[in-house]
From Swiss-Prot:
Lineage: superkingdom: Bacteria
Name assigned to this protein: ATP phosphoribosyltransferase
Pfam families linked: HisG, HisG_C
Keywords: Amino-acid biosynthesis, ATP-binding, Cytoplasm, Glycosyltransferase, Histidine biosynthesis, Magnesium, Metal-binding, Nucleotide-binding, Transferase
Compartments where located: Cytoplasm
Record-listed E.C. numbers: 2.4.2.17
The protein's role, per its UniProt record: Catalyzes the condensation of ATP and 5-phosphoribose 1-diphosphate to form N'-(5'-phosphoribosyl)-ATP (PR-ATP). Has a crucial role in the pathway because the rate of histidine biosynthesis seems to be controlled primarily by regulation of HisG enzymatic activity.
GO terms under biological process: L-histidine biosynthetic process
Gene that encodes the chain: hisG
């Protein structure tokens, strides 16, 4: 198939989103083999090419129409959109959906000895960051002036190195901040991974493939968020038991052989079934309670 007819999806070459992005696509039935020495991986069973690139290149590739889709952190997407708007370059794309991985937050942090009250405490100080546009937007909204120190990595060492008074960096657990004598003060942006599409018109066949991939992604994400619940229940407490099942659709109720006083309940729950809920179910006479993961869902 000509390259122009193949769907091009950009993903992070290496880093926190790379493995999860490839896992997601494989869960959607896209088969491919990655050669670490090559930036392009061709799907074995679908007209799809994966471009493995730097994460901060992905938004621009999608916005310029070089690739058709991309999986990227919302923080990187927003940073690039602000920069492109400033430079009067193409800055639009279609955000298809958030994904269930890559959660992090962009936060301000200061040295442990810093007497921090609120963001105004940073007035006139130097802040190191890899996200100058998101930081600038936040500080402008607060009416705070500051000096920025642009770094591409190792932002957390800037205060100790005498490069800045504070930092604005991505935080997942806070362990890196603690190891560098810093503490988090303000969250300025919450982020997850998301999947985006070029806003340029697509040929019908390619758009149909995009829609198919998105439908499968929706099914994979729904399955991760859901559990399949099976249990036996007395008919006299059936309504109470069904009411306890968290986020469940209308369950399937089936008779049990040789037991007219009990039924089998099959249900899909979109919320966690906690131990205390299971104990309540048991008190109502439920037995043989099974809670199982779901691999795929559709419809």
């Amino acid at each position: 198939m000509p390259e122009s007819k193949r769907l091009r999806i950009a993903i992070q070459k290496s880093g926190r989103l790379s493995i999860e992005s490839m896992k997601l696509l494989k869960s959607c039935g896209v088969k491919f083999t990655v050669n670490e020495q090559r930036l392009i991986a061709h799907s074995d069973n679908m007209p799809i090419d994966l471009l493995r690139v730097r994460d901060d290149d992905i938004p621009g590739l999608v916005m310029d129409g070089v690739v058709d889709m991309g999986i990227i952190g919302e923080n990187v997407l927003e940073e690039e959109q602000i920069e492109r708007e400033r430079l009067d370059k193409p800055s639009t794309c279609i955000k298809l959906r958030e994904l269930d991985f890559g959660a992090c937050r962009l936060s301000l942090a200061v040295p442990n000895e810093f007497n921090y009250e609120d963001a105004a405490s940073l007035e006139g100080l130097r802040i190191a960051t890899s996200y100058p546009n998101l930081l600038r937007r936040y500080m402008q909204r607060k009416g705070i002036t500051y000096n920025d120190c642009m770094l591409k990595g190792s932002v957390e060492v800037a205060p100790r190195a005498g490069l800045s008074d504070a930092i604005c960096d991505l935080v997942s657990t806070g362990a890196t901040l603690e190891a560098n004598g810093l503490y988090e003060t303000e969250v300025i942006y919450q982020s997850k991974a998301c999947i985006i599409q070029s806003s340029q018109p697509q040929e019908p066949a390619k758009q149909a493939l995009i829609d198919k991939i998105l439908s499968r992604i929706n099914g994979v994400v729904r399955a991760k968020e859901s559990k399949y619940i099976l249990l036996h229940a007395p008919t006299e407490t059936l309504e109470q038991i069904v009411a306890l099942l968290p986020g469940a659709e209308n369950p399937t109720v089936l008779p049990l052989n040789d037991d007219t006083n009990r039924v089998a309940i099959h249900a899909v729950s979109t919320e966690d079934l906690f131990w205390d809920t299971m104990e309540e179910l048991t008190k109502l006479g439920a037995s043989s309670i099974l809670v199982m993961p779901i691999e795929k869902m559709m419809g």
